[in-house]
Amino acid sequence: MLEELKYLSETPGIGGRIKVKPEDFIVREIIPKSIFKGNCQIYLMKKRNWETIAAIKEIAKRIGIHYSEIGFAGTKDRHAVTYQYISVCRDVRKEVEKLKIRDVELKFVGYGRPLKLGFLLGNFFLIRVRDVKRPELIPKIIEELKIKGGFPNYFGIQRFGEKRSVNHIVGKLLLEGKYEEAAEVFLGYPGNGMEGDEARKRFLETKDVDLALEEFPKFLRYERAMLYRYRETRSWKKAFLVLPRPILRIFIHAFQAYLFNLYLSRRIEEGLPLNEAIPGDIVVQVKRGIPLRTRTYRVTETNVDFVNEKIKRGEAMVSGPIFGYSYRKAHGIPGRLEEEILDENEVNVEMFKKLPKPMREPGGRRELLIKPRKFAYKRKEEEVLFKFFLPKGVYATSVLREITKH
């Protein structure tokens, strides 16, 4: 899926492998100082080889609270060492001090507001790339990307499912109202040697719900919840709606991300600039290096020079579509590209409004380029250590993809 997307730089890649060990991918969350004004307890959570939600659920179980009482600002990679903040709005310090969970550590850092998804500025990354073939090409790649304005802001594989890249497929089928087919993909498509793969394959062949409930491992709790609900109602739509809203939104968000990636790749393919606006574009405002995706304005023949001056000063960025029922549509050539992407995928924006309420998505805009801050690298034989800061919602793997070219 990602291999089909166009690279922005023409210089060959350096090759190499990432995430050979969790310690090769270190992420530290950066949150606003204003968070530390309130009465909730704020902890810094260090985890290794844990998914964020799984770690939070385990912590909640051990300290005797419901996992919904733990707030967090963003999900982090599983196969990594990550540092992120969590909040608990009751006194659990004694319980936390006694806590012993393998590869999870909590440190009390103060009091503040309850954390919610999106309450972060971004993340600082320290990433080791091993078995690099041509490290001498890094300066040339970086210089070429500097001229072109940055790295293409593709959504990374994490958005679609690292082990089972099916989230966007499920999302499209849900958008089309094909609930049975969506269930077959979500429940039946196997991963890459994952536990439960044989049970998934058997369900895809037999469609036997009772057998699936016997064979699906207990940790596949969302899949099992759907199977139980279908057995009760004989409705795959009702079976999907038993899932928590954040899970349902993952599917729709993944399809939106898939369409955005196609748009960005098409724009590169057609030779349209990413760091320069053309009439019809929608640009997002930038403040202190952080794109403000809800603050947008349209580019016209009249204001195009003014807008491009703002882009040069780092006060604005060209955006692409996050398709939804009320997203701000581009005009002109960019608008034509947006229509082409929708037509080729046989969807329209009104479909995002006709979804069941928990899945409806208004859409928005997303900047086309990544401009890493504090970017640096260090070579050591066949390894390269990269470090940089990225705003929230931007993928470090997309930065590395442009450098390694795979």
UniProtKB/Swiss-Prot annotation:
Top EC class of this enzyme: isomerase
Domain of life of the native organism: Archaea
Keyword Transcription included in the entry's annotation: no
GO BP term (any one): tRNA pseudouridine synthesis
Active-site residues per Swiss-Prot or TrEMBL entry: D77
UniProt xrefs under Pfam families: TruD
Catalysed reactions, as listed in the record: uridine(13) in tRNA = pseudouridine(13) in tRNA
InterPro entries (alphabetical): PsdUridine_synth_cat_dom_sf, PsdUridine_synth_TruD, PsdUridine_synth_TruD_CS, PsdUridine_synth_TruD_insert, TruD_catalytic
PROSITE patterns: TRUD, UPF0024
EC assignment: 5.4.99.27
Keywords in alphabetical order: Isomerase, tRNA processing
Segments traversing the membrane: none
Domain TRUD: 150-371
Molecular-function annotations in GO: RNA binding; tRNA pseudouridine(13) synthase activity
Family, as annotated: Belongs to the pseudouridine synthase TruD family.
Function in brief: Could be responsible for synthesis of pseudouridine from uracil-13 in transfer RNAs.
Protein name: Probable tRNA pseudouridine synthase D
Primary gene name: truD
